[in-house]
Amino acid sequence: MNIKKGKFLETILAEKRLEIAKMPEEQVGKVRQTYNFYDYLKEHSDQLQVIAEVKKASPSLGDINLEVDIVDQAKNYEQAGAAMISVLTDPVFFKGNIEYLCEISENVQIPTLNKDFIIDKKQINRAVNAGATVILLIVAVFENQYPKLQNLYNYALSLGLEVLVETHNKAELEIAHQLGAKIIGVNNRNLKTFEVILQNSVDLTPYFKEDSIYISESGIFSANEAQKVSDTFNGILVGTALMQSENLEKSLKDLKVKRKTNEN
């Protein structure tokens, strides 16, 4: 599907509402057992931790790696030291599938993130039943709808999920803090234009709070880029660079750069 420049998020959300209308109501089960992602990053603060993403395609890049065996890719991520695996489940724009999340969650021991544009409780129930232990809520999706964001955030926590709350600017970061979010992402990609500026992560660091952990998302391909955010961020989310890597283990380990923390 073609998207007009500047209309990325608007177009995706319109399609998402159609998808949800057809989505069946599911009786929610129990969240899969694994370690707590927040605690893990707090306890492993000497290195920048990596959320490794399984992503076949994207609106900005088109096809990335359509032939990938998603389970093998996820297992390789786990063996190479990823702290969590992010799984794209949007079928239209990212060529993802909820079944990918099911298959990966059944074959790894570490946390899995349902990466999608979540705007409804039906999606959260589905994520739990597919094996996710963390979901993504994007502040930009809930423009002028803070009560809805708060409701979905609290609902996810009540089920035993962790929530990665994604922000892009200072105003959205303040909303994440207002929510009481413990895991906060800073997306270097503007979801309205899809442009990526790594400096975006750096610019927001003066507003960070000590109790939360912070993840820099998008635009990180090398150890040098990882190093730029390593002192103030606890982790990074990386998809394209790992999906295209010819030496996945080395690529992932190179991204886990040393951090300067209060302890070292």
UniProtKB/Swiss-Prot annotation:
UniProt keywords, alphabetically: Amino-acid biosynthesis, Aromatic amino acid biosynthesis, Decarboxylase, Lyase, Tryptophan biosynthesis
Pathway in which this enzyme or protein is active: Amino-acid biosynthesis; L-tryptophan biosynthesis; L-tryptophan from chorismate: step 4/5
Molecular function in Gene Ontology: indole-3-glycerol-phosphate synthase activity; phosphoribosylanthranilate isomerase activity
Keyword Secreted part of the UniProt annotation: no
Entry-linked CDD domains: IGPS
Highest taxon, organism lineage: Bacteria
One GO BP annotation of this record: L-tryptophan biosynthetic process
Classification via NCBIfam families: PRK00278.1-3
Family from the record: Belongs to the TrpC family.
Protein name according to UniProt: Indole-3-glycerol phosphate synthase
Recorded name of the encoding gene: trpC
